[in-house]
């Protein structure tokens, strides 16, 4: 009799163990994933022209091509540089068929503007002063149930590495403080000259200033586009997307080298992450 009781007890334990260790249902897995991970697709693009042109800012005739790239790649947010102003942004938003809303930064000492486009209709935009320039930050959610993130669109001085360094330091100070309450991504054209063989480094401190600027960013943020290679003509990697160091996963990282039109000298950089 006792043998039957032992066998019955073992059978009950097996059933209980099978139920306990059974794989969760797909809905449970989905809910768990949504609680622990949020995906985000970002794109940055300097849509201006090469230095030899009379006007190196973005050209209105190129906006349909810019809109086509954005609609095709479907990023959650876009950082743009070298727009001529708010009128140009409104034209671009119209070409995007109401899928995005956006803003341009305040005007600094120059004649061109940074901008951010986002899908989130509830996004807010904040100008960020750095030296005599203005970057622009957007706070938004990639999905309704996702945590808030911040994307900062930046454009550092193209001609003076010391000014780039001062600009970068102020920008990162702001980003570090903001990152205490939300993940921060910094995207744009930093114009860093980090290749020792670059002829413009001869008899200058450009390499030193730019290397220290880049290192300063990497103390708090991760270079998400490093694997994608050059982002501009003449073998330059001067466009970046920096993000938190503790991302769960970095997915697609790509420079869209067939996207440039007219005499653009930059290509868009696309990065997908989970955080």
Where are these regions (language model features)?
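Short aromatic-enriched loop/helix-cap "lid" or pocket-rim segments at secondary-structure transitions
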Residues: 53-57, 91-92, 163-166, 196-202
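N-terminal, active-site-proximal structural segment of metallo-dependent hydrolase catalytic domains
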Residues: 2-95, 275
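Active-site beta-strand/loop signature of hydrolases that rely on acidic residues for catalysis
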Residues: 40-47, 66-89, 138, 150-154, ...
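Extracellular/periplasmic catalytic domains that process cell-envelope and extracellular macromolecules
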Residues: 34-37, 71-72, 94-98, 108-110, ...
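Metal-dependent phosphoester-hydrolase catalytic domains
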Residues: 4-8, 17-31, 130, 139, ...
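Extracytoplasmic/secreted proteins, especially bacterial periplasmic and envelope-associated proteins
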Residues: 61, 65-68, 87, 91, ...
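Structured beta-strand-rich core segments of catalytic domains in phosphoester-bond hydrolases
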Residues: 77, 81-156
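Solvent-exposed loop/turn segments at secondary-structure junctions
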Residues: 47-50, 83-87, 108-111, 123, ...
């Amino acid at each position: 009799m006792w043998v039957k009781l032992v066998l019955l007890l073992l059978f009950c334990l097996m059933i209980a163990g099978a139920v306990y260790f059974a794989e969760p249902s797909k809905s449970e897995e989905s809910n768990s994933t949504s609680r622990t991970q949020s995906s985000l697709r970002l794109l940055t693009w300097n849509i201006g022209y090469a230095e030899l042109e009379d006007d190196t800012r973005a050209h209105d005739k190129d906006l349909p091509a810019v809109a086509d790239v954005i609609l095709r790649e479907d990023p959650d947010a876009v950082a743009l540089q070298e727009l001529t102003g708010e009128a140009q942004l409104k034209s671009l938003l119209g070409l995007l068929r109401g899928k995005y809303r956006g803003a341009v930064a305040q005007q600094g000492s120059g004649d061109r503007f940074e901008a951010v486009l986002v899908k989130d209709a509830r996004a807010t935009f904040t100008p960020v002063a750095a030296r005599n320039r203005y970057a622009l930050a957007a706070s938004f959610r990639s999905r309704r149930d996702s945590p808030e993130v911040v994307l900062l669109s930046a454009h550092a001085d193209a001609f003076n590495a010391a000014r780039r360094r001062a600009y970068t330091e102020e920008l990162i100070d702001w980003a570090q403080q903001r990152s205490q309450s939300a993940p921060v991504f910094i995207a744009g054209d930093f114009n860093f000259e980090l290749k020792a063989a670059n002829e413009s480094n001869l008899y200058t401190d450009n390499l030193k200033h730019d290397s220290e600027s880049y290192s300063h960013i990497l103390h708090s943020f991760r270079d998400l586009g490093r694997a994608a290679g050059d982002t501009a003509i003449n073998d330059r990697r001067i466009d970046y997307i920096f993000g938190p160091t503790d991302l769960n996963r970095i997915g697609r990282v790509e420079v869209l080298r067939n996207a440039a039109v007219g005499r653009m000298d930059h290509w868009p950089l696309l990065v997908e992450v989970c955080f």
